[in-house]
Amino acid sequence: MAAGAPAGRRHPDRDWLASVQAALAWWADAEPDWPTSSVLGSGAVAAAEAAFSERHGGRPALLLPSATYALRVALQAAGVTAGDQVICGAIDWPAGYAAIVSLGAVPVPVAADPLTLTLDPAAAAAARTRETRAVLACHLHGVCADVPALRRLLPGVPVIEDAAQAFGSRLDGRLAGTMGDAAVLSLGPGKQIDAGEGGVLLCRGRARYQRAVAIACHPLRLLLAGQPPPAPAALSVRPHPVAAVLALHRLAGWSAAAERSGHEETARRLAGHTSLRLLGDTRRHQSSQPHVPVLLPDGHPALPPPGLSWLPSAAGVLPGLAAPERRRAARLLARVRLAASTGR
C-alpha cells in the first residue's frame, strides 16, 4: 500500500491494473517466435503490427509510441519538409496541426463539410498550390472524411487519414484506414483499442512503409529488414513493449461489427428528436464509436433528452485560422455535443 493511503481504500487504478495483469497473463500463454523487443520490432510488437495489418486489408502496419508521432512520421514518409503546405480541416483535433508544424511545414486549414464537420473535398481542391505536399483528413468523432473524393480531386497529393477516433468506422463500406495513402490509429486512453498509449501507422504499399521504418525505427530493425541504416537525424522513438501486449489483448476480444451495431441503435434513438441533427449520412457513414455526434440548434435546452447523456465535443479550432473564421468555427463548435446511450 502506498504511504499515507487510507486503510481499506479501493485503489483508483484497480480496474486498469487488473486489465494489464490479464493481458500479461494472456501473453504469457502465447507462443511467439521471438522475444518481445521494441528495438527489433519482434515478439508482441510484430504480432500487434500483423494483427492491425490483417484487419486493414494487409496494409503494412507500424506500431509507434503515440498517434501524434505516427502522424508526424506519416507526413515525413509523404515527403513533407519545412516550408511545404499541408491541407487540413478548419475544425480538427490539435494534434494534426502539431504534427504539421513540428516539421516546419505550413497548415492550410480549409472549410468543413457542414454535414460531417470533416474536411470538405471541394474546398481542399481549391486550396491546392505548387507548395501542397499532403492532405491530412481527420475522421472526427468516428465520421469518416470523404477520402475517395479527396484522392480524386487532388491527384498526386498524398492523403493521410487521421483515424484516431475512427477505428472500425466505414464510409460506403470501405474501412477507415484503408482509403488513403497512409492512416493513423490511436491506442490512447478512451479509444476503442486502449493500450494506455500508442499509435499505429498503416501504409499503402511497401515503399511508403519502408520509408516510415527508416524514419521511426531503431537501426537494428532496419538491418534485420535488409534496409540501409537511417539518416543521422532519425529519432528512433519506439513504443513500450507492454503497450503491444495490451493492444493485442484488447484487439482479440473486440468486434467492429458489434460496435457499429451499437452506434446505429444509439443513432436510431436520437433520430427521433427533431431538434437534433446527426453528423454524417447514415447511408454512407457507419461509425464504430460508442457515441453519436450531433449538432444542437441555437437556444437548445441544456437538459438532454430522457435516457441520454451528453459529453463535450473533442474537436478544436486550428490556431492558423483567420479571426473571423475562428469566431464562426468557435460558434459552431459551441453547438457540438457527443450524445451516448446511458450505460454504454
Tell where the protein language model's regions lie, with residue ranges.
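Conserved PLP-anchoring active-site segment centered on the Schiff-base-forming lysine
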Residues: 74-128
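PLP-dependent aminotransferase class I/II
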Residues: 43-51, 55-59, 122, 134-138, ...
